[in-house]
Regions:
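N-terminal helix-cap/turn-to-beta initiation motif at the start of protein domains
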Residues: 1-12
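Generic preference for hydrophobic/aromatic residues in regular secondary structure cores
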Residues: 14, 76, 84-85
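A short, Trp-centered hydrophobic/proline-enriched beta-strand micro-motif
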Residues: 12-21
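Glycine-centered tight beta-turn/hairpin loop motif at sheet-sheet or coil-to-beta transitions
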Residues: 22-24, 51-53, 78-81
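Amphipathic, interaction-prone secondary-structure segments
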Residues: 26-50
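Short, exposed beta-strand-loop hairpins at the edges of beta-sheets
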Residues: 25, 69-77
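Structured surface patches comprising rigid loops and adjacent beta-strands/short helices at the edges
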Residues: 33-39, 53-71, 81, 88
Length: 88
């Protein structure tokens, strides 16, 4: 989570690719571009806000950070919902 926050602090309007799945592998959203205009760092979650006002709430206690051939990736899990984000 600290690496994600440092990335958000380092630049304006950072773009992530976002993938959202349910536990049964139902695809809710895939490879959506999400431009972070602002963010809120709360005790138990972080809220990413797009310039159109839409937001994505990510639970801190469900965060797993990993690296692969695509670079920096984060997985957030809450209940049966999983959100994967990675820097474009």
């Amino acid at each position: 989570m600290e690496k994600l926050l440092s990335l958000l602090n380092a630049s304006d309007d950072i773009v992530f690719n976002v993938n959202i799945f349910l536990e049964d592998d139902t695809v809710m959203l895939t490879n959506a571009k999400f431009t972070v205009y602002d963010y809120y760092d709360e005790d138990d979650h972080i809220c990413l806000v797009q310039d159109n006002g839409a937001s994505l709430v990510l639970p801190k206690d469900g965060c797993v950070y990993f690296e692969d051939e695509e670079g920096d990736n984060w997985r957030f899990k809450q209940g049966d919902l999983e959100v994967y984000i990675y820097e474009e």
